[in-house]
Amino acid sequence: MSEAGGGKKPPVEPQAGPGPGRAAGERGLSGSFPLVLKKLMENPPRETRLDKEKGKEKLEEDESAAASTMAVSASLMPPIWDKTIPYDGESFHLEYMDLDEFLLENGIPASPTHLAQNLLLPVAELEGKESASSSTASPPSSSTAIFQPSETVSSTESSLEKERETPSPIDPNCVEVDVNFNPDPADLVLSSVPGGELFNPRKHKFAEEDLKPQPMIKKAKKVFVPDEQKDEKYWTRRKKNNVAAKRSRDARRLKENQITIRAAFLEKENTALRTEVAELRKEVGKCKTIVSKYETKYGPL
């Protein structure tokens, strides 16, 4: 007999049913899973062990660095940071704190005048001072870098006291006024004592007697002496009188010349001083107006 289509049908394989071998394999896998997990926990992979060792080393380094910084800061001053400020790059913000409360909490003395001037200080500034003092603790000159408000206050007070002190009186003889005075050299020679220093009209001083008016002296009447009585004694006395009269005339002329040149210089100096005083009065008037405006606006000084 021939089949339809002229082909042969493939043989049908028998389906494997749930036999006893497959069930035994599944039970073996489920039983070996706890053993594998236990081995992994006892002997972790190499990468996990390296990460744990690195974390432990980093933690030990941080602890040793913190202990060293605390030891350095303890050598300079008592520890003042009991709490650390977290810093993650975004949530860090500068905050202001009360300096008085901060000093009282940490037992640090401070000058009241300095506290009155600087009541609030930023935390970053205080932290910067602490880090600078701890980093420079090894050299002996680091103690001079610590801020000492008491010394600065005393120095400012001493400078203010020096400014308030009245200046010492000035000798009027040492004061020189710029005066365009150029006397004739011949007049200076005539006003100088022969054989002495050249007369200086700027610094020369006269005695009170020299500045007093001189009385007019009447000349004595001439007495006629005949030639028979003009003996040697007469001529000696007459020569002495002539020399004395010449000396008195020369001294009087010298004094008159000195007074004349000195008076000319004083007149020019007086004119220069008057102009200077006028300028000073203008400046003082301006200062007075400024002070009066300030007092009317803000009250008396």
UniProtKB/Swiss-Prot annotation:
Keywords: Activator, Biological rhythms, DNA-binding, Nucleus, Phosphoprotein, Transcription, Transcription regulation. The modification Phosphoserine is found at residue 30. Residues 39-59 have a biased composition (Basic and acidic residues). The gene is Tef. The lineage of its organism: Eukaryota, Metazoa, Chordata, Craniata, Vertebrata. Binds DNA as a homodimer or a heterodimer. Can form a heterodimer with DBP. Changing residue 266 to V: Diminishes DNA-binding. Changing residue 273 to V: Diminishes DNA-binding. It comes from Rattus norvegicus (Rat). One of its GO terms (molecular function) is identical protein binding. Gene3D superfamilies: 1.20.5.170. This is Thyrotroph embryonic factor. Residues 233-253 are annotated as: Basic motif.
